Amino acid sequence: MVRINEHYIEISNSYLFAEIAERVNEYKQNNKNREVISLGIGDVTQAIAPAVVEAIHKATNEMACTKTLRGYAPYEGYDFLIQAILKNDFTDKGISIEADEIFVNDGAKSDTGNIGDILGQDNHIAITDPAYPVYVDTNRMAGRTIELLPCTPENYFVPNFPRKTADVIYLCYPNNPTGIALNAAQLKNWVDYALTNKSLILFDAAYEAYISQQDVPHSIYEISDAKKVAIEFRSFSKTAGFTGLRAGYTIVPKELIIQTSKGKMLSLNAMWRRRQSTKFNGTAYIVQRGAEAVYSIEGQKQIRKAIDYYRGNALTIKEGLESLGVTTYGGINAPYIWVKTPNNLTSWEFFDLLLNKIQVIGTPGDGFGQAGKGFFRFTAFGNKEDTLEAVLRMKKLLEFH
């Protein structure tokens, strides 16, 4: 008799954004003459940088020639991309990372979800609440115990330490969904906690390109001794518009040495390399050439232009809602604006109000966890015209609601 992984019973039947898509599609079917504007799922709208497109075209042409054809990529990524990452994201910023600590992937979601493969099932997991659903769901799928760390206006969305000592801690900063960032002192507190308690921090830095304030670290490795306690995840999705291309990378320092139940010391770097060689066949050559071009002089100028475009959208949403007396958070160091729902509406009531009355989509906060109840997330990834129109519609609605 076949047995299933019954931990799947403990998670929601549908992924948050799949549920939203289902509701929106149903609305569109019944209201085909209505123009719906999405400020919901964090998918990009601006074209891939020309430097990246040119590199992808060139790599595609290489694949058409027997002499330059590339097959399976190295499990950890091609050296040309690893060296570009190393120089631009770390060495030039004074951060010491070695090439064999970088693992190229097909997007941060894969590795944040799969990192649990090398971690024991009996680890006590601490996750901020609200949080990117993947952190919670993947650990529930594995049957691990989870302690949620509420992030609310009362603690300025900066979590307190767990009640029970955490073995593994998920931190995403700048944060999805709240848009809040940790300064260096706040992040150091967590590194010190991990050092004291022999914990592992899983640090999701997918939105570091949107940091605008000087005292906000772009990498956890800016904090002294963080390489002893932290794995960092990076993404090209929001930095360079790779949501449809799929590329990112993970840093697993060689200083991360964990003791087994029998007292043997094992390297997480070696374990992750072994895991990847078994379950991952590498990111496509064409995509990695595109990612390499992100670090070219022209590529950097072009992606910065797109990032500034999205930052402008964030400011439009934030200022527009605040002009109505709506309380907002984030939007300064991240492409997300976290909103207190007006008039004591629940998150889903506000979702339905916006969809049915003005055809604007956002994301209900309680889809990110219990602490998200009564909140709502807007993203800055729409195009400028749609963002302005959505804010105008919300102003007309909320002024009289």
Swiss-Prot record:
Keywords: Aminotransferase, Pyridoxal phosphate, Transferase
A GO BP annotation: lysine biosynthetic process via diaminopimelate, diaminopimelate-aminotransferase pathway
Record's catalysed reaction(s): (2S,6S)-2,6-diaminopimelate + 2-oxoglutarate = (S)-2,3,4,5-tetrahydrodipicolinate + L-glutamate + H2O + H(+)
UniProt xrefs under Pfam families: Aminotran_1_2 (PF00155)
Annotated substrate binding sites: Y15, G42, K109, Y132, N176, N281, R377
Sites of N6-(pyridoxal phosphate)lysine modification: K238
Enzyme Commission number(s) from the entry: 2.6.1.83
Cofactors, names only: pyridoxal 5'-phosphate
Pathway: Amino-acid biosynthesis; L-lysine biosynthesis via DAP pathway; LL-2,6-diaminopimelate from (S)-tetrahydrodipicolinate (aminotransferase route): step 1/1
Ligand binding (pyridoxal 5'-phosphate): Y72, A108, K109, Y132, N176, Y207, S235, F236, S237, R246, N281
Residues of the signal peptide: none
Residues annotated as transmembrane: none
Keyword Kinase part of the UniProt annotation: no
Superkingdom classification of source: Bacteria
Record GO terms (molecular function): L,L-diaminopimelate aminotransferase activity; pyridoxal phosphate binding
Quaternary structure and partners: Homodimer.
Family named by the database record: Belongs to the class-I pyridoxal-phosphate-dependent aminotransferase family. LL-diaminopimelate aminotransferase subfamily.
Protein role: Involved in the synthesis of meso-diaminopimelate (m-DAP or DL-DAP), required for both lysine and peptidoglycan biosynthesis. Catalyzes the direct conversion of tetrahydrodipicolinate to LL-diaminopimelate.
Protein name per UniProt: LL-diaminopimelate aminotransferase
Organism: Azobacteroides pseudotrichonymphae genomovar. CFP2
